[in-house]
Amino acid sequence: MEDKGVRIALVVVNLFAAVSAIVGAVGLLVGFMDIPLSELTGTPFADFTVPALLLGIVVGGSALVAAIIALFGPRRFEALASAAAGCIMVGWMAVEIAMVGLDIWVQAAYFVVGLVMIGLAGLLQWAKSHQPGVSGQPHAHRLA
């Protein structure tokens, strides 16, 4: 199986996740997003500063690093970096939904984006492990 298409899809999804998380973080920090502070009732946050920084640095940063690794980094780390970024996105959305509830469809959509990142990373790893070896046969996986 050719992994080029999977790699391209993974880069696109990672870049989308990175850019949208970073833009969302900036929007929260500078007040462009019209989200009332009452949304934070019952959370440990008095304002959106800490959530915005976490969103931009941790969620957006991990997706950006995963995209950069997939584009320019060592191929052996691209699936791992993307899966980690996807897990961070899924975890972020799960915690957000648990803390403030499922208020808008965007929360569910980004949860799915995280799952897509994980799925594409797994597919890329599978494709790489099933490329024909020197003998023309797929690499064998041994349990022992």
Which ranges hold each PLM region?
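Topology signature of small-to-medium multi-pass alpha-helical membrane proteins
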Residues: 1-144
